[in-house]
Structure formats: structure tokens, C-alpha cells
């Protein structure tokens, strides 16, 4: 969308999901960071299970007038990119295929729109999701940094992976009797850069608290660190999403749907940094 077509001004984008009669969503139209400087874009966050769901969009002027209307989906854009012979798109095709497989695995795991899987347009060969290499699982299963966590009054209890609009690591901590969680801080780092302080939340167990850290391709495989401090001393928890995946992979409770989801997640993240 270019400025020569419309007087962009303070335009907004209104969007709804096809078949959804709920409240519409609005996002700003911003100048695109790529291109000729006259292009504009809007960002709409789509979760992994929503890749085949149609999104209906309207470009609105600052007075509310509808300037343009169109419909698209992650699947639609992915198919056009995969079918393109443009040389610059070739490098993105492996990650797009991995993304569609991750979307399909997410749909099957959560039972969402399983009649329209994200990878349905791929060849049978491209739909095949390989297992996570055993050497990789073994590497992340042996995380000695977890066992080094040590601080008076607070104990690392375990971690889980929360899969939703974002993938988050949730770390659980248990307090000794009489201890107050407000006396501890939880600083999160990625690749040596401090991201901020995580706010502890009380879990269903009254003596248990957890913090959540959003995962990105920067910290999926390495570089994620939480430093817990009581004001006098510090202790470190080095734990990546792959540490949890390696543990879950070896669990007797692992279902085929979860295994496929973890495999697809691994290869999607792998392709993003390849």
C-alpha cells in the first residue's frame, strides 16, 4: 500500500476474523521500515493455530471512510511466497514450510480448525516432521546449571512451557516457611542483555510462585538466564525452552500430539536462525 494511492494521514486498519461477529480490532498504519519510504504497513499478531483463519481488513481514513477492503490469511501469504520464483524469496521457503507444519501441529494439539490444517497445501514430503535429533535432546537434558541453583529460603521447583499467542517459559519457585517473595528479585537476561525484572505470581499452591519469560528465536536454544537476588547474594538459573522440551520428550506421559508439536516447534525455531 503506497502513499501515492491514498492520502495516508492518520489512517487506521480495522480487522475481524471471518465468521466472528465480536468486537472488531483496530491497528495503526505505520511507515514501512523497508521499501522506498512511501510504503505503509500494519502488524496483526496471529497465533500458531490461526494460520488458515481468514482475516477481513478495511483501510479507514481519519474520518472513518472505508478506503479499501481485502481478505487474507497467513496460509494465503505463505502459499504465494512458496509459489514465487523470485530469487530473494528462496531463502525464506524452508522457514515458511516449517512454520506451516508448526501451525498444523498446534491445531491438532489444541483441537482448533483441524479441518483446515495450515500445512495442507504442502507436498507429503514437506509435511513430514522429523524427530528432534537425539544428540540435541541429550545435550539439553543434561543441564547442570539447574542443579547449581542455590539460595537460602527459596528453591527452584521446576519449569513448564506455556504455548499460546507467545511461547513462554514458566519457572516455579518454592519458599521456606516464613519467607516473603517480595524479598527476592528475578532479573531476566537474553544473550547477556538484561530484559527486565519478572514479576512473581502466586500459583495454586500457596507456597509456590512462578515467573514467566517470553521466548524468541534469540533465546530458544541458548542465552536465557534468570538471576535471583535477595539483596545480598545472587544465584543463577540457566534454562532454555529446549531444556523443557528435552525433559518432556523423555516423559512417559508424552502423547503423540505433544511429540509432534514439540518436533514442529523445534524445526521452526531451527529454521529461523539457520
Give the positions of each predicted feature.
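Short, surface-exposed linear motifs at loops/turns and structural transition points
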Residues: 1-274
Amino acid at each position: 500500500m503506497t502513499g501515492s494511492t491514498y492520502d495516508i494521514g492518520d489512517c487506521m486498519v480495522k480487522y475481524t476474523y471471518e465468521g466472528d461477529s465480536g468486537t472488531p480490532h483496530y491497528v495503526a498504519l505505520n511507515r514501512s521500515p523497508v521499501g522506498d519510504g512511501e510504503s505503509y504497513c500494519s502488524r496483526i499478531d496471529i497465533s500458531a493455530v490461526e494460520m488458515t483463519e481468514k482475516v477481513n481488513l478495511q483501510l479507514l481514513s481519519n474520518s472513518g471512510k472505508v478506503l479499501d477492503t481485502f481478505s487474507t490469511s497467513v496460509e494465503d501469504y505463505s502459499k504465494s511466497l512458496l509459489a514465487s520464483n523470485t530469487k530473494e524469496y528462496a531463502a525464506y521457503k524452508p522457514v515458511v514450510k516449517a512454520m506451516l507444519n508448526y501451525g498444523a501441529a498446534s491445531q491438532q494439539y489444541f483441537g482448533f480448525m483441524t479441518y483446515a490444517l495450515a500445512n495442507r497445501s504442502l507436498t507429503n514430503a514437506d509435511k513430514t516432521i522429523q524427530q528432534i535429533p537425539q544428540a540435541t535432546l541429550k545435550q539439553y537434558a543434561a543441564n547442570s546449571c539447574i542443579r547449581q541453583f542455590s539460595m537460602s529460603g527459596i528453591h527452584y521447583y521446576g519449569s513448564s512451557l506455556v504455548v499460546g499467542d507467545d511461547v513462554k517459559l514458566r519457572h516455579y519457585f518454592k519458599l521456606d516457611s516464613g519467607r516473603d517473595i517480595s524479598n527476592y528479585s528475578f532479573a531476566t537476561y537474553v544473550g547477556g542483555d538484561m530484559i527486565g525484572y519478572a514479576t512473581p505470581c502466586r500459583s495454586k499452591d500457596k507456597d509456590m510462585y512462578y515467573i514467566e519469560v517470553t521466548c524468541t528465536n534469540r533465546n530458544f536454544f541458548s542465552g536465557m538466564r534468570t538471576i535471583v537476588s535477595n539483596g545480598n547474594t545472587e544465584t543463577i538459573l540457566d534454562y532454555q525452552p529446549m531444556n523443557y522440551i528435552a525433559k518432556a520428550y523423555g516423559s512417559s506421559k508424552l502423547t503423540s500430539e505433544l511429540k509432534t508439536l514439540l518436533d514442529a516447534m523445534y524445526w521452526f525455531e531451527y529454521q529461523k536462525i539457520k
